[in-house]
């Protein structure tokens, strides 16, 4: 179930403030955030945002096809190590 259209998209205020501060300055550095729940806006395009996955910050370069998605969708939190092997053949 998606978010109601009358509410509009959500992004944390501190993340928007960091994006605005970088758009005013000429240098583009990596923006660290813990806000996986924030929706990607068109003003985020071209920036690299380091999203926290529970262990480290993973850099994500924002492209125009990512607009409307959440930041957390592009950074997995779990690592799959494969299913257990069948040890019956070795015995």
UniProtKB/Swiss-Prot annotation:
UniProt feature coiled coil, ranges: none
InterPro entries for this protein: Ribosomal_uS19, Ribosomal_uS19_bac-type, Ribosomal_uS19_CS, Ribosomal_uS19_SF
Molecular function, one GO term: structural constituent of ribosome
Entry GO CC: cytoplasm; small ribosomal subunit
Record keywords, A-Z: Ribonucleoprotein, Ribosomal protein, RNA-binding, rRNA-binding
Keyword Ribosomal protein included in the entry's annotation: yes
Pfam families according to UniProt: Ribosomal_S19
Spans through the membrane: none
Biological process according to GO: ribosomal small subunit assembly; translation
Cystine connections: none
Similarity comment: family membership: Belongs to the universal ribosomal protein uS19 family.
Protein's job: Protein S19 forms a complex with S13 that binds strongly to the 16S ribosomal RNA.
PANTHER family: RIBOSOMAL PROTEIN S19P FAMILY MEMBER, SMALL RIBOSOMAL SUBUNIT PROTEIN US19M
Name used for this protein in its record: Small ribosomal subunit protein uS19
Biological source species: Lactiplantibacillus plantarum (strain ATCC BAA-793 / NCIMB 8826 / WCFS1) (Lactobacillus plantarum)
């Amino acid at each position: 179930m998606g978010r109601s259209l009358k509410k509009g998209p959500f992004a944390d205020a501190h993340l928007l403030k960091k994006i605005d501060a970088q758009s005013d300055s000429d240098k583009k550095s990596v923006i660290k955030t813990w806000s996986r729940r924030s929706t990607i806006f068109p003003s985020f395009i071209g920036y690299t945002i380091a999203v926290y996955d529970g262990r480290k910050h993973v850099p994500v370069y924002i492209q125009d096809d990512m607009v409307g998605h959440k930041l957390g969708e592009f950074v997995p939190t779990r690592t799959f190590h494969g299913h257990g092997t069948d040890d019956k053949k070795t015995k």
